A protein has these predicted regions:
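Exposed, low-structure sequence patches enriched in small/polar residues
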Residues: 1-337
Length: 337
């Protein structure tokens, strides 16, 4: 089965068109085996690490301050080796133009190329599927879920780079009748040599201006491009106690506490002439979230759930003024009935 998609957009601030498209062919529906070719000419946040879902990607771009223009050609194939194990292999060529002023190893870096092969594995314990027509649909996402990404920079074109990059994550969910739901995510990454800014790890923070959303698995009090790393390890913890105080049709507040911590490192930091910090010491923050303050049904299909959260930066990287360490955010979730 052949599937086609595409998009066209226009940037009001940079006055440039963004566009892309994808052609996908399903080889074996029962194993979700497919191959695809995608092209895009777009703008993306510099140094993003593990994959986010669509809403989180939009949220990250909303608060990000450093971007790159990317022209990419990508050939990709993926399938389920077994019910819980999925394999994805891709070959990508990118022409990258930083939309920020930056010098690398003493020379201005106006553009570069990034050509790579990437292998991704996802293992979801207990994941369940069903076939709806010719489509394989996930009915239970699995718990815990492990991911592993290996990227090999090929460096076969001029002004491109050879490197090895690894990222891995583990997500755990536990339920308790008295204490509610516990979510834990552990993630880390490593690059084996000095590379330009956009090929390293940054963008772990999601603190915006006066208005921003809570984005899961990011640091809510950290500015998007505050730190730069070629190695990192993060832990995100959230305890949701549920709606134990009030329950009404449009008002079912759920109380949660959160604690996030991360550490990183960067070799040859002097190679990069741009403002950043290195996360040599643990970065810590804690938060209180009230989800589902407003619960709005839409078309009898989903609930739009609005809430609020407050997070406090503390430890080695806290600021002198209390208000600078505080981040107030809006919680937005969509839940199917």
């Amino acid at each position: 089965m052949l599937f086609r998609s595409g998009y066209v957009g226009y940037g009001v601030l940079d006055k440039k068109m963004k566009y892309g498209g994808e052609v996908e062919y399903t080889l074996n529906p029962s194993r979700s085996a497919k191959i695809s070719y995608a092209y895009q000419n777009t703008l993306k946040e510099v140094g993003s690490s593990m994959n986010f879902n669509l809403f989180e990607e939009y949220g990250k771009n909303f608060v990000a301050t450093r971007f790159e223009y990317i022209i990419e050609n990508k050939l990709e194939g993926d399938f389920h080796i077994s019910r819980p194990l999925k394999l994805d292999v891709s070959l990508s060529t990118k022409d990258v133009t930083p939309a920020y002023t930056y010098s690398y190893k003493g020379s201005p870096l106006l553009n570069y190329r990034s050509d790579d092969v990437k292998l991704s594995l996802r293992y979801a314990v207990g994941e369940k599927h069903t076939m709806i027509g010719i489509y394989r649909t996930v009915t239970f996402a699995g718990n815990p879920v492990f991911t592993f990404d290996y990227t090999r920079g090929l460096g076969f074109r001029e002004n491109s780079f050879t490197y090895n990059k690894i990222e891995a994550s583990a997500d755990f969910v536990a339920y308790n009748r008295l204490f509610g739901q516990t979510n834990v995510r552990i993630e880390g990454g490593y690059v084996d040599r000095s590379l330009p800014y956009g090929l390293l790890f940054s963008g772990e923070g999601s603190k915006g201006g006066n208005f921003s959303f809570i984005l899961e698995n990011t640091f809510q009090t950290m500015h998007p491009d505050e730190f730069l790393s070629d190695k990192y390890a993060n832990l995100f913890f959230k305890q949701n106690f549920g709606a134990f105080l009030f329950k009404a049709k449009y008002f079912q507040p759920e109380f949660s506490v959160a604690y996030n911590i991360g550490i990183g490192g960067l070799r040859n930091a002097s190679d990069h002439e741009i403002d950043f910090n290195v996360k040599k010491h643990p970065y810590q923050e804690s938060g209180l979230i009230i989800d589902n303050i407003i619960r709005i049904p839409i078309l009898n299909l989903v609930y739009l759930r609005l809430g609020i959260g407050g997070f406090l930066r503390h430890g080695h990287y806290e600021y002198d003024k209390f208000e600078d360490n505080l981040s107030l955010k809006t919680s937005l979730k969509i839940l199917f009935k």
